[in-house]
């Protein structure tokens, strides 16, 4: 788990969007993410990626369901209000990019043994 407020510099932005380098919208993505501070979050838990993506809603705001972050607050796809990793490999890469080891914390909640199924 981790949380921090970040003013993203161009280098970090370009590394974050590296998979879009060379595409016509790359510079717009970089310019937008460096335009203001953002909150970087790292979640952990059962199905964390799927849960966060469901809370975020569809990438295109007009396709996002009401009650999701994008459905309620996003206006345009290019200036996306929220990002979530699309799978475990991307999550590992993005965690390394956005957080140092001392910024991530692990803990066990006592209630977890009562509400979470044991791992198989």
Language-model segments: which ranges?
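Non-catalytic terminal and connector segments of soluble metabolic enzymes
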Residues: 1-120
